[in-house]
């Protein structure tokens, strides 16, 4: 049994929300990134990711399910021919939302929603190789910097003491000078 979506309808009725999300998804798949209000971007993210999941499966049934929502056949072809295969190795997280400055006219919070185009999935062997390399580097690195840091720390303490000594001398000279002027100005009885 169909149940209505909870929460606000993004400026209208349920049918308006469906049309709005379909149009936003069409623009997203056509251009790769769009700028819209933040609530619309947050509503579009799961909608678009479900459509991309259908495109990854690539069956006729999935194509017809997407065509129910997106009416532009060229965009659906792009979705199934390019976007779906690109995300074949990725398990979700196909879109990214980046907040940008508010809209000038009404100060509405704006965001850019875009398709993630970087490959982030790595093989376990590659990941294990990088972990070993980082552990080896971290074991070799601490012995040298600690030895180098100790003399540097001693030099820094000596430099701050040297800087503090002239400043203290200047302060006492200034205090003495002000005491002399106070004595000259004081009335004598």
Curated annotation (Swiss-Prot):
Residues 125-189 are annotated as: Disordered. GO terms for biological process: translation. Coiled coil: none annotated. The keyword Ribosomal protein applies. Keywords: Ribonucleoprotein, Ribosomal protein. Residues 140-180 have a biased composition (Low complexity). Gene3D superfamilies: Ribosomal protein L17. GO terms for molecular function: structural constituent of ribosome. InterPro entries: Ribosomal_bL17 (IPR000456), Ribosomal_bL17_CS (IPR047859), Ribosomal_bL17_sf (IPR036373). Part of the 50S ribosomal subunit. Contacts protein L32. Belongs to the bacterial ribosomal protein bL17 family. NCBIfam families: L17. This is Large ribosomal subunit protein bL17. It comes from Mycobacterium ulcerans (strain Agy99).
């Amino acid at each position: 049994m169909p149940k209505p979506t909870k929460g606000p309808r993004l400026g209208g009725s349920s049918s308006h929300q469906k049309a709005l999300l379909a149009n936003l998804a069409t623009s997203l798949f056509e251009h790769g990134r769009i700028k819209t209000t933040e609530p619309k971007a947050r509503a579009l993210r799961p909608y678009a990711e479900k459509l991309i999941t259908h495109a990854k499966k690539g069956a006729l049934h999935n194509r017809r399910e997407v065509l129910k929502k997106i009416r532009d056949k060229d965009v659906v072809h792009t979705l199934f021919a390019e976007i779906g295969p690109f995300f074949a190795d990725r398990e979700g997280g196909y879109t990214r939302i980046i907040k940008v400055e508010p809209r000038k006219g009404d100060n509405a919070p704006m965001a850019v929603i875009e398709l993630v185009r970087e490959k982030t999935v790595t093989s376990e062997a590659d990941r294990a190789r990088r972990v070993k390399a980082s552990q080896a580097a971290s074991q070799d690195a601490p012995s040298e910097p600690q030895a180098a840091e100790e003399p540097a720390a001693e030099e820094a303490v000596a430099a701050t003491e040297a800087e503090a000594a002239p400043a203290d001398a200047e302060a006492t000279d200034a205090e003495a000078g002000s005491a002399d002027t106070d004595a000259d100005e004081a009335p004598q009885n």
